[in-house]
Regions:
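Outer-membrane beta-barrel transmembrane domain signature
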Residues: 153-224, 252-254
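Residues that define the transmembrane beta-barrel architecture of outer-membrane proteins
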Residues: 42-46, 77-83, 123-131, 162-170, ...
């Protein structure tokens, strides 16, 4: 567990050192579904995010770190870390297919939970490898982006509890500056849909996290600073049915 945590922190350090990086800090108010309220309320999440285009394609990565401040969580610790790293390969920028790339991706994480004895136990979170096609339309500065992905998804699960007959994932990513012609307002987010076998039956999973940010720093010569909100909407993600988790946050852009 310590080795895995060390590798995760190395990833954090690498992402933070890159251009095109931002860091977000969210307070999670918990699920609007009262049956799930105690599972997600009163938690703080740090997200470190990177997007870096180059002449061979682009690299995207993020790391989520959840901090324990809820009475049911392990005390004084980062109790969950989750990361995604995706690389798009494109060697045909001058061809008619310039907006289409080959994408390879890794998803996974580590968590801490309480055992029946009251102690802490570590566990892995859906380690998965993905490969497929990425279609991306964007402005020259990538401030406005429209991105569709169709990926084959392999979930590493020795017990075959999560395997699906059609192991595909569909992803839609968007970003829009000056949303609704409002200067400094940015609307962005993603939508993931994939198939996954649940504990009892086949099911499909949906996760979307739309964000709305306002560049408050533009009013006092600090354009890196943003405040905003994120709403996590999921279906069959961490439990059965629909969950809606509103958050408030601040963001700092390093570029």
């Amino acid at each position: 567990m310590k080795k895995h945590l060390f590798l995760l922190l190395l990833c954090v350090a690498w992402i933070s050192a890159q251009a095109g990086t931002n860091i977000q800090l969210f307070y999670d108010f918990g699920s609007l579904n009262t049956a799930c309220q105690n599972e997600r309320s009163n938690r703080i999440t740090t997200t470190i995010e990177l997007f870096y285009p180059d002449k061979w394609g682009s690299t995207f990565a993020f790391i989520d770190l959840d901090y324990a401040i809820h009475p049911n969580d392990p005390k004084n610790t980062i109790f969950l870390g989750y990361t995604e790293i995706a690389r798009c390969l494109n060697f045909w920028h001058e061809s008619p297919a310039k907006d289409l790339s080959i994408q390879v991706e890794y998803n996974g994480g580590l968590g801490l939970g309480r055992a029946n004895t009251g102690g802490l136990i570590g566990y892995g979170i859906s380690h998965a490898g993905l490969i497929g096609l990425n279609y991306c339309l964007h402005t020259k500065d990538y401030k406005n982006i429209f991105n569709l992905e169709l990926l084959y998804k392999y979930i590493a699960d020795g017990d075959n509890k999560l395997k699906n007959k059609v192991p595909l994932q569909f992803t839609f990513v968007w970003g829009c500056d000056d949303f609704c012609t409002a200067p400094g307002l940015r609307f962005c987010g993603f939508l993931d849909i994939w198939g996954q076998r649940g504990p009892d039956k086949q099911s499909w999973v949906m996760l979307t996290e739309p964000q709305l940010w306002y560049n408050v720093g533009r009013w006092f010569k600090c354009p890196n600073l943003h405040v905003g909100t994120e709403i996590e909407v999921s279906y069959n993600f961490t439990g059965s049915g629909v969950m809606v988790n509103p958050c408030l946050g601040i963001k700092w852009n390093f570029d």
